[in-house]
């Protein structure tokens, strides 16, 4: 499992067309917390449990996290 980045979370939420409120309902993490996580440096303040919920929700919605050494972080939609 690759490390999730702020950019990937932003890109995935945007690709799905979800507002913070919609994303919050889907992943059971407060909209305020999601906003904080999506801010620069926000991952440092996120709990492992919240990051797990975010990743699982986005993957269940058809998001694949891509990118590796030499590549920038990205996302791809499968559904």
Stretches with model-predicted labels:
Residues 1-4:
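A detector for short, charged/polar N-terminal pre-domain segments
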Residues 8, 33-36, 74:
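Residue-level recognition of specific faces of alpha-helices
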Residues 9-22:
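Short basic helix-loop element that most often maps to the first helix and adjoining turn
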Residues 14, 28, 39:
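Residue-level detection of the helix-turn-helix DNA-binding "recognition helix"
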Residues 19-36:
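Short alpha-helical DNA-recognition segment
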Residues 38-51:
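Short, charge-rich, low-complexity interaction segments located
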Residues 48-65:
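DNA major-groove recognition helix of helix-turn-helix/homeodomain DNA-binding modules
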Residues 63-79:
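Helix-turn-helix/homeodomain-like alpha-helical modules used for DNA recognition
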């Amino acid at each position: 499992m690759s490390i999730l980045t702020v950019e990937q979370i932003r890109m995935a939420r945007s690709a799905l067309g979800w507002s913070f409120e919609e994303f919050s309902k889907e992943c059971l993490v407060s909209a305020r917390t999601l906003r904080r996580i999506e801010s620069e440096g926000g991952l440092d303040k996120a709990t492992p449990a919240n990051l797990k919920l975010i990743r699982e929700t986005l993957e269940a919605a058809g998001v694949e996290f891509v990118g590796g050494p030499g590549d920038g972080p990205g996302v791809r939609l499968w559904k």
